[in-house]
Amino acid sequence: MEISLMKFLFLGIWVYYYSVLDSVSAMDSLLSPKGVNYEVAALMSVKNKMKDEKEVLSGWDINSVDPCTWNMVGCSSEGFVVSLEMASKGLSGILSTSIGELTHLHTLLLQNNQLTGPIPSELGQLSELETLDLSGNRFSGEIPASLGFLTHLNYLRLSRNLLSGQVPHLVAGLSGLSFLDLSFNNLSGPTPNISAKDYRIVGNAFLCGPASQELCSDATPVRNATGLSEKDNSKHHSLVLSFAFGIVVAFIISLMFLFFWVLWHRSRLSRSHVQQDYEFEIGHLKRFSFREIQTATSNFSPKNILGQGGFGMVYKGYLPNGTVVAVKRLKDPIYTGEVQFQTEVEMIGLAVHRNLLRLFGFCMTPEERMLVYPYMPNGSVADRLRDNYGEKPSLDWNRRISIALGAARGLVYLHEQCNPKIIHRDVKAANILLDESFEAIVGDFGLAKLLDQRDSHVTTAVRGTIGHIAPEYLSTGQSSEKTDVFGFGVLILELITGHKMIDQGNGQVRKGMILSWVRTLKAEKRFAEMVDRDLKGEFDDLVLEEVVELALLCTQPHPNLRPRMSQVLKVLEGLVEQCEGGYEARAPSVSRNYSNGHEEQSFIIEAIELSGPR
């Protein structure tokens, strides 16, 4: 009996030991043989190779097991390092080859520092890299051909360095590149065919070929081997002097011609009253002068204000060609450097989808940062749900489901199809606009990150509206695609109830957080009571239950329990098919309408609630 008991105890200890060992092995998947997180070791090597006079890397500690809390380091929900945003930090030294060990990296921004030495070829090991910006440094040597192995690379900027040699064919031929900037280096040789949709190679005097507009020549310089006699040499000198004199005369005549042409051109400009600031275009984006924006908005007249929120004031504007636009005048422009602002604007401009608000252009001065969008005549979903639009059509049940579908399509594009991927971080009814056909247009994407440049860490500033912010984002500052899924679930509830996420009323149910109120009604099978009274009972009971179930699934407290937006989209597409199949008008269901007595509060920024379209 004692022997059997001893065997049983030994077997239990053995099972416990190996279960603990398995757990430790799982935890050690990120550890090196010395017990140090390999990403920590790689980041420390990057730090040690750099000179950090501003001590922005002082928080990077070799004894730390989690680099996700470090400045300028962004991580995925699984804990892998996916972004290093170290632009304009006064860093010098070299870029360590250990950068190639951060194999989950999606974004690497090191522009506007003073880094020297070659660009590490180990960057070619970052198979998931989508955005690489090393511009405005002093990198020398050749462009590593290994960058051509980065098949996910969408944005590559190496401008304003000291790079030499030829442009690698592998890099030029990257089919996924949307933007390539190699301007203002010392590159030479023939320029290969460049696959990027938008590229720049100006400022490389020794580049030749069609892309550089300089012809390549295979001719070699002819050496001087004339062997002339002194008499012939004298005649030769006379010819040279005559030729030089002719060149000088021609040069003087050319200067006189140029002088008179400038006078004529200036008078022509004066007569046509063309007085515009310097402007240029970035791809399809137009850069407006400040004077143009002033004129379009009647000098930022209060009569043209469409709304005000955490990102700044929004004005209605009229361009000379009759186009109506919405101008977003960003707050605190001094915190975003011109190059950084231009980089972020280019990334936002690359996101083009029928359910996304297209960026039309921008304005950038030392004191101002403004974004120009098409004007949405039907305002936002929040406007339609809560404001009186007179005789304009209201949002019926089918239209609300269709709006949810359109918004989902826009978010799926941002999360899974846009390159680089974009997390919205403030999905709500006020940021879903309606075009002429009442199709949902997702607005304000990319702006939270654009204004986070003042922060040293990619996610230190929590941006969003109380009630719409996912719990993990609010508590840790770490955002992911699941953060937007939470906000989308809240949007569905806003469409169903017609109320803000944080609302108070005087009915039998006094609502604070709409989410908890809906959960209570759902548990009690009282679905009809949560429906907006403006629908007058005309809604589909079965679709309502499924939509509520979907919204509550999207707003699960833990991000891993929430579906991906692509999964949400599939469910909504099925529900839209049911709605399009039609439904008979039902007797008005019991619904309670509560007054919007309190405005939404905001965390760090105010809620962007616009009284008119943006």
Curated annotation (Swiss-Prot):
Its EC number is 2.7.11.1. One of its GO terms (molecular function) is coreceptor activity. The chain crosses the membrane at residues 243-263. ATP binds at residues 306-314, 328. It holds the Pfam family PK_Tyr_Ser-Thr. The keyword Repeat applies. LRR repeats lie at residues 104-126, 128-151, 152-174, 176-197. It is found in: Membrane. PANTHER family: LEUCINE-RICH REPEAT-CONTAINING PROTEIN DDB_G0281931-RELATED, PROTEIN KINASE DOMAIN-CONTAINING PROTEIN. This is Probable LRR receptor-like serine/threonine-protein kinase At5g45780. The lineage of its organism: Eukaryota, Viridiplantae, Streptophyta, Embryophyta, Tracheophyta.
